[in-house]
Amino acid sequence: MPQIRWGRVDRMLRPVHRWIWGDSERRVRKLLAFAEVEADGGRDILRASEVTPDPLLRRLYLAHAIDELRHADLFRERGAALLQARPARATPLSAGWLPAGDHGIDDLRVEDEPDESLLAFLHVAEKAAAGRFTIYRDVVQDDPSTRAVFEEILRDEVFHMNYTYTQLARVSPERYRQRVWRARASRLWKRYLRVAASLAGLIGTVMLTIQYFIVLPPFAWFAKRAERRESPGWTPIPRDRDRSPTSQY
C-alpha cells in the first residue's frame, strides 16, 4: 500500500486526534458514525452504477459500493465489540463540534450528476478519507483490532482514490484537472459551512450560559431586594381616587 503522509494541519492537530480517540466512548461513537457514512456512501454509489451509461464504470461503481458496505460492517462490528467491552460510566464531553473527517456523498444527487462530476467528487473524498484514516490508524496504537480495521479499509481507499482519477482522465481528458479542483473547492466550502454552524452553536451555548449565570443574577438580586421593601398585604387606595373623572384625561 502506498505511504500516505500526514498534512501540516493534521500534524498540528495530532494531540486533538489522540484526545478524541483516547476515550473509549468517543472511539465507539466515531466508529459507529463511520459505519453510517460508509453505508450511505455505498448506497449512493450503488445507485450510480445503475444510472451510468458506461459499462466499465458500472462494474467499478458496483465493486466500490460493495467495498463501502463491507467497510460499514467492519466499523459497526468493531464499534459494537468496544461497546460491549467498555466499563459503565458517565458520558464524557462530546467532540461532535470538531470536523468529522469522514467522506460521505454530502447529499450529492447521483441521478443529476454526470460521471465526470461524480468521479471528481469521489476522488477528492477518497483521497481525504485515506489521509484521515491513516491518522486514525496511527493514533490507535493501543488498540490493535481497531488499527487492523483501518489498515484493511485503507487498502480499499487507496484503490478507490486511484481508479476514480484514472477513469476521470479517461472520460474527461481535457478538463479532468479542472473538475478535481472544482470538487475540492466544493468540498472545502461545505466543510466550512459545517464547521461554522457547529462553531456558531458552541458560541451560542457559551453566551447563553454566561447570560444565565453572570448577567441575570444581579437583576434577580435587585428584584428580591425591591420585593423586601414592599409592605405585605393589601395596599390602601387614597379616597380621592374614588371620585368620578371629569374628563377622559
Predicted regions, residues:
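Non-heme di-metal
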Residues: 1-231
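Juxtamembrane, membrane-proximal amphipathic segments and lipid-exposed surfaces
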Residues: 228-249
